[in-house]
Swiss-Prot record:
Active site per database record: C410
UniProt name for this protein: Urocanate hydratase
GO cellular component: cytoplasm
Binding residues for NAD(+): 52-53, 130, 176-178, 196, 201, 242-243, 263-267, 273-274, 322, 492
GO molecular function: urocanate hydratase activity
Primary location class: cytoplasm
Location within or outside the cell: Cytoplasm
Pfam family, one: Urocanase_N
Amino acid sequence: MDKRHDPSRRIIAPHGTKLSCKSWFTEAPMRMLMNNLHPDVAERPEDLVVYGGIGRAARDWECYDKIIEVLQRLEEDETLLVQSGKPVGVFKTHSNAPRVIIANSNLVPHWANWEHFNELDKKGLAMYGQMTAGSWIYIGSQGIVQGTYETFAAMATKHFGGSSKGKWILTGGLGGMGGAQPLAGTMAGYSVLTCEVDETRIDFRLRTKYVDKKTDSLDEALAMIDEANKSGKPVSVGLLANAADVFAELVERGVTPDVVTDQTSAHDPLNGYLPQNWTLEYAAEMRKKDEAAVVKAAKQSMAVQVRAMLALQAAGAATTDYGNNIRQMAFEEGVENAFDFPGFVPAYVRPLFCEGIGPFRWVALSGDPEDIYKTDAKVKELIPDNPQLHNWLDMARERIAFQGLPSRICWVGLKDRARLALAFNEMVKSGELSAPVVIGRDHLDSGSVASPNRETESMLDGSDAVSDWPLMNALLNTASGATWVSLHHGGGVGMGFSQHSGVVIVADGSDEAAVRLGRVLWNDPATGVMRHADAGYDIAKKCAKEQNLDLPMLEK
């Protein structure tokens, strides 16, 4: 019997102000763990899989039940340790310490590969936490929509004179991360054609309004895109097809999109990418019989797709890797020039990271959407001079369906995160918000990740693979008084290719929370400015000086 599979489970986080734990500082991680497994949030909640191939919230259902049980009894001066989704210890600490410390899928570097991890996983000794799956702060596809929107907008500025009108994007994958692409693309003014092999994922994105139309015909999909471009009304199309097949077919036809990228779960060739000419059922069967054959076939198909991406780039398409490590997989399969198209971070996002700007997010523990709308208004009030941010908040309210507990993602940086959090805390204190909020971020942030094929690709000083930075980030956030802190390996790009840390903190309206919020949400983004200043980025050095960061080795 698979201890990770239970189709009878239907997890819904409690709403409102009634506590089932001893304080909001333990109620919050409990609700957020449960929210990660909400049927409208998780990809396969019956298997504890939240997103990203096999990114889980807990190691198995026995561990999940025990985590909930412990959180409900945890005292305000105790800390729960969670090792790869398993609650392994409760220790006496102090009231300002994190209530939960999480470490997921960390392996000694020599053994940090999928083969060794999969052996441990089979024995029930490990769990792949992805980024926000195992750290209990996943908010559905909204969590990546704004970052994707900002990237597509930056591509329009860089490649199309600032206008995306009449332009279209070709991409793959409609899972938990990839599902953001069609909505982000149309919000940025493009039409979007997304290939997906799992029809249930297309249907889910249709239901939540992330995708406009669905077809299983490439000809029909291209006709939809063409009609939308002529009418000036962007459309997103979910095409039931294998991305490798479609990308190669477009090269064959001489059809060149304006933008090409991909967000299939290529980081995990065993569980995340369907080889060409395979059905989902056959792949599931083969994973049990011959894992090596699945990996080989998946990588061969990735090589086909990447060769097509390179050909489309040569034909004039703006082509970028969107952080799933597909270039690395193709390179290992013999595509020597796989890295000839850039990753999205060095190409479009790094200047934001230099100012500590990244995917700040918050969740209304009340379950009341009005609490989020009130915080949206507060963000506009406190940041009045950022029309792009205001536009994002307006579009998000209009077009993004909440998944599970209501939440918001908002890319802000060092100068704004702490003051926004303190304002939210005051709103809880005054009763303007009906219950506390949790504030966190993706692990994809400026100071919390080392990932040479994604966030830290092509660093100015060559420090791409130095992972001291996320370790220091996690330790500093623990010392600063976050509510829960996580340290993971392999998120986004797969085992052996990244280390990263997460942080979440509760705003419960108390004066004590205000002190912790001010510390954590200043120190956390400040480590990103520090990391980029240390690497030699002038924008980061300027930001550090303007914000009076004490960086001993930075020239005054």
